[in-house]
From Swiss-Prot:
One of its GO terms (molecular function) is 4 iron, 4 sulfur cluster binding. It holds the Pfam family GcpE. InterPro entries: Dihydropteroate_synth-like_sf, IspG_bac, IspG_bac-typ, NO2/SO3_Rdtase_4Fe4S_sf. Keywords: 4Fe-4S, Iron, Iron-sulfur, Isoprene biosynthesis, Metal-binding, Oxidoreductase. The gene is ispG. Its EC number is 1.17.7.3. It catalyses: (2E)-4-hydroxy-3-methylbut-2-enyl diphosphate + oxidized [flavodoxin] + H2O + 2 H(+) = 2-C-methyl-D-erythritol 2,4-cyclic diphosphate + reduced [flavodoxin]. It comes from the Bacteria. This is 4-hydroxy-3-methylbut-2-en-1-yl diphosphate synthase (flavodoxin). Belongs to the IspG family. The lineage of its organism: Bacteria, Bacillati, Bacillota, Bacilli, Bacillales.
């Protein structure tokens, strides 16, 4: 069996100010739900996604007016912009001219070779990569005829076909996705893709469903793929506010220790020993740390039985009891706090730890700059 190309051994590809692949972190992506030509609405949604932790955003581009809006959108956002093109190569050219950071296009679907050459030439001139988007639901007719139905081998064959078109034009800034709505098919397709080539892979389970069902399905599929060391960017596709996609993606990365810039909550399940409103407190703390870009582990425990000993890996936490709680760090009690103020005191300690982390990071940057 061919060896899987680990995410850290994939080709590095520049997307705006980010580098995808190589030794770089797995990056979170989402997609807007707005009409792209509505610049105000699109920018507003992208800024909400940015705030939630989205690192790359994709927009639809079915019409010329959408492509013409790219330049104005780019002026107002801070993260790389991917433009989704289907069939019409002229829209790709307009988007590239407008400042797109990446183009999502299947070169085999946009017509004659000279059209592909024009897109590739424009991407080369601007240093823009191309994402080849293979989808089990839209495989080429000849591949479906060969395999009878969507298969992992058929998806890899489709990817290699599109890759060869670009490679024949001496273009190698390529990212590939192998999306399917069937979890087992997606796992097999991504595994075989990682064995077939070393281009970075964008992960996704397409059409995964609503917020609850889609979260479970995406976590099951993408978690299995990520556990193999596969994947350089990911999108959680949900029938929900795209901000929820980003939240789920962040939690998934944290679960695998792949998010160095996010705080993590540890909280115990409820039981009859609990004498505080654990669920409300845990939700409040989770919301509070959701925008903290520091690798802190924060624990919220319902009683002294579970804490602080059982959460000794946490940087900071509280264990509740009737009328008071224990504030602890690294498994050791720091002090007792009144129940009515323990959440606020926990937040203050979280802020202190985050500030210490940021100062340390800044000092390290200065030290490295002086070398």
């Amino acid at each position: 069996m061919p060896e899987i190309t680990h995410r850290k051994n994939t080709r590095p590809v520049k997307v705006g100010d980010l580098t995808i692949g190589g030794s770089n972190e797995l990056v979170i992506q989402s997609m807007t739900t707005t009409k792209t030509h509505d610049v105000e609405a699109t920018v507003a949604e992208i800024k909400r996604l940015e705030e939630a932790g989205c690192q790359i955003v994709r927009v639809a581009c079915p019409k010329e007016e959408d492509a013409l809006a790219i330049a104005e959108i780019k002026k107002q956002i801070n993260i790389p912009l991917v433009v989704d093109i289907h069939f019409d190569y002229k829209l790709a050219l307009l988007a590239i001219e407008g400042g797109a950071d990446k183009i999502r296009i299947n070169p085999g679907n946009i017509g004659r070779r000279e059209k592909v050459e024009e897109v590739v030439k424009a991407c080369k001139a601007k240093g823009i990569p191309i994402r080849i988007g293979v989808n089990a639901g839209s495989l080429e007719k000849h591949i479906l005829k060969k395999y009878g139905y969507p298969t992992a081998d058929g998806m890899v064959e489709s990817a290699l076909h599109h890759i060869k078109i670009l490679e024949d034009l001496d273009f190698h800034d390529i990212i590939v996705s192998m999306k399917a709505s069937d979890v087992n098919l997606a796992i097999e397709a991504y595994t075989k893709a990682a064995q077939a080539f070393d281009y970075p892979l964008h992960l996704g389970i397409t059409e995964s469903g609503t917020l609850f069902a889609g979260t479970v399905k995406s976590a099951a599929g993408l978690g299995a793929i990520m556990s193999l060391g596969i994947g350089n960017t990911l999108r959680i596709s949900l029938s929900a506010d795209p901000v929820e996609e980003v939240k789920v993606a962040r939690e998934l990365l944290k679960s695998f220790g792949l998010a160095s810039n996010a705080a993590t909550l540890i909280s115990c399940p409820t039981c009859g020993r609990i004498e505080i409103d654990l669920i409300s407190i845990a939700n409040e703390v989770e919301e509070y740390i959701s925008t903290i870009k520091a690798p802190l582990k924060v624990a919220v425990l319902g009683c002294a039985v579970n804490g602080p000993g059982e959460a000794r890996e946490a940087d900071i936490g509280i264990a509740g009891a009737r009328g008071e709680g224990l504030l602890f760090m690294k498994g050791k009690t720091v002090r007792k706090v009144p129940e009515e103020t323990m959440v606020e005191e926990l937040k203050m300690e979280i802020d202190k730890l985050a500030e210490e982390y940021f100062k340390k990071q800044e000092a390290e940057k200065l030290a490295n700059a002086e070398k």
